[in-house]
Amino acid sequence: VTNSVLIAGSLAARGVEGVHMLGGRVRGVTHTTVGSATVDAIRRLRVDVSFVGANGFSLRQGLSTPDPSEAEVKSAIVRAGGTVVALADASKYNSDYLVRFADLAEVDVIVTDKSLPTADHSALVDQGIEVVLA
Protein backbone atom coordinates (compact mmCIF):
# COMPACT_ATOMS: atom_id res chain seq x y z
CA VAL A 1 0.00 0.00 0.00
CA THR A 2 1.47 3.34 -0.99
CA ASN A 3 0.49 6.91 -1.70
CA SER A 4 3.60 7.36 -3.87
CA VAL A 5 2.98 7.33 -7.61
CA LEU A 6 6.69 6.63 -8.18
CA ILE A 7 6.85 3.68 -5.77
CA ALA A 8 3.64 2.15 -7.14
CA GLY A 9 4.95 2.50 -10.70
CA SER A 10 8.35 1.05 -9.83
CA LEU A 11 6.83 -1.98 -8.10
CA ALA A 12 4.36 -2.57 -10.94
CA ALA A 13 7.19 -2.35 -13.50
CA ARG A 14 9.02 -5.07 -11.58
CA GLY A 15 5.98 -7.34 -11.74
CA VAL A 16 5.08 -7.08 -8.06
CA GLU A 17 1.49 -8.27 -7.70
CA GLY A 18 -1.03 -6.73 -5.35
CA VAL A 19 0.33 -3.17 -5.18
CA HIS A 20 -2.42 -0.96 -3.77
CA MET A 21 -2.22 2.71 -4.77
CA LEU A 22 -4.12 5.11 -2.52
CA GLY A 23 -6.35 7.61 -4.27
CA GLY A 24 -6.53 11.32 -3.73
CA ARG A 25 -5.13 14.52 -5.18
CA VAL A 26 -1.66 14.04 -6.66
CA ARG A 27 0.83 16.55 -5.30
CA GLY A 28 3.25 17.24 -8.15
CA VAL A 29 6.21 18.22 -5.98
CA THR A 30 6.35 14.85 -4.22
CA HIS A 31 4.38 12.65 -6.67
CA THR A 32 2.21 11.47 -3.80
CA THR A 33 -1.51 11.45 -3.17
CA VAL A 34 -2.81 13.73 -0.44
CA GLY A 35 -6.11 15.04 0.80
CA SER A 36 -9.21 13.68 2.48
CA ALA A 37 -9.63 10.71 0.10
CA THR A 38 -6.10 9.55 0.87
CA VAL A 39 -6.44 10.03 4.62
CA ASP A 40 -9.84 8.29 4.70
CA ALA A 41 -8.40 5.29 2.84
CA ILE A 42 -5.46 5.04 5.24
CA ARG A 43 -7.72 5.24 8.28
CA ARG A 44 -9.51 2.09 7.10
CA LEU A 45 -6.23 0.17 6.95
CA ARG A 46 -4.24 -1.72 9.53
CA VAL A 47 -0.72 -2.63 8.46
CA ASP A 48 2.06 -4.52 10.23
CA VAL A 49 4.76 -1.97 9.35
CA SER A 50 4.46 1.64 8.22
CA PHE A 51 7.33 3.37 6.43
CA VAL A 52 7.22 7.15 6.47
CA GLY A 53 9.70 9.73 5.23
CA ALA A 54 10.38 12.91 7.18
CA ASN A 55 11.73 16.27 6.04
CA GLY A 56 13.00 16.82 9.57
CA PHE A 57 13.28 15.02 12.89
CA SER A 58 14.35 16.14 16.32
CA LEU A 59 13.97 15.31 19.99
CA ARG A 60 11.97 18.49 20.47
CA GLN A 61 9.46 18.28 17.61
CA GLY A 62 9.55 14.66 16.48
CA LEU A 63 8.91 14.12 12.76
CA SER A 64 7.94 17.12 10.66
CA THR A 65 7.26 18.35 7.14
CA PRO A 66 6.66 21.79 5.63
CA ASP A 67 3.36 20.85 3.94
CA PRO A 68 0.12 20.47 5.94
CA SER A 69 -1.49 18.09 3.42
CA GLU A 70 1.57 15.83 3.49
CA ALA A 71 1.57 15.97 7.30
CA GLU A 72 -2.05 14.83 7.46
CA VAL A 73 -1.29 11.78 5.30
CA LYS A 74 1.93 10.97 7.15
CA SER A 75 0.15 11.21 10.50
CA ALA A 76 -2.51 8.75 9.30
CA ILE A 77 0.22 6.39 8.05
CA VAL A 78 1.94 6.46 11.46
CA ARG A 79 -1.32 5.59 13.20
CA ALA A 80 -2.14 2.76 10.75
CA GLY A 81 0.99 0.73 11.45
CA GLY A 82 2.01 -1.59 14.22
CA THR A 83 5.72 -0.89 13.78
CA VAL A 84 6.55 2.62 12.57
CA VAL A 85 9.78 3.06 10.60
CA ALA A 86 10.87 6.63 9.84
CA LEU A 87 13.24 7.26 6.94
CA ALA A 88 15.41 10.38 7.08
CA ASP A 89 19.04 11.05 6.29
CA ALA A 90 21.22 12.49 9.05
CA SER A 91 21.18 15.99 7.55
CA LYS A 92 17.51 16.19 8.56
CA TYR A 93 18.26 15.69 12.27
CA ASN A 94 17.52 18.78 14.38
CA SER A 95 15.60 20.28 11.46
CA ASP A 96 12.06 21.26 12.43
CA TYR A 97 9.46 22.15 9.82
CA LEU A 98 6.08 23.83 9.97
CA VAL A 99 3.95 20.77 10.77
CA ARG A 100 4.74 17.98 13.23
CA PHE A 101 3.11 14.73 12.15
CA ALA A 102 4.46 12.32 14.79
CA ASP A 103 6.10 12.44 18.18
CA LEU A 104 9.26 10.37 18.57
CA ALA A 105 7.36 8.22 21.08
CA GLU A 106 5.27 6.97 18.13
CA VAL A 107 8.36 5.86 16.18
CA ASP A 108 9.90 2.42 16.65
CA VAL A 109 12.80 2.63 14.19
CA ILE A 110 14.63 5.46 12.43
CA VAL A 111 16.65 4.52 9.36
CA THR A 112 19.27 7.16 8.68
CA ASP A 113 22.82 7.32 7.36
CA LYS A 114 26.15 6.82 9.07
CA SER A 115 26.92 10.54 9.26
CA LEU A 116 24.59 10.90 12.26
CA PRO A 117 26.88 11.97 15.12
CA THR A 118 27.34 9.44 17.94
CA ALA A 119 25.83 11.78 20.55
CA ASP A 120 22.69 12.24 18.44
CA HIS A 121 22.46 8.49 17.85
CA SER A 122 22.68 7.92 21.61
CA ALA A 123 20.03 10.57 22.32
CA LEU A 124 17.58 8.81 20.00
CA VAL A 125 18.36 5.39 21.50
CA ASP A 126 17.79 6.88 24.97
CA GLN A 127 14.26 7.72 23.77
CA GLY A 128 13.68 4.01 23.09
CA ILE A 129 14.09 4.26 19.33
CA GLU A 130 16.04 1.70 17.35
CA VAL A 131 18.41 3.56 15.03
CA VAL A 132 19.52 1.78 11.87
CA LEU A 133 22.52 3.33 10.13
CA ALA A 134 22.39 2.47 6.45
Residue spans of the language-model regions?
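Active-site catalytic microenvironments in core metabolic enzymes, especially phosphate/sugar-handling
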Residues: 3
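Conserved phosphate- and dinucleotide-binding cores of soluble alpha/beta proteins
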Residues: 6-134
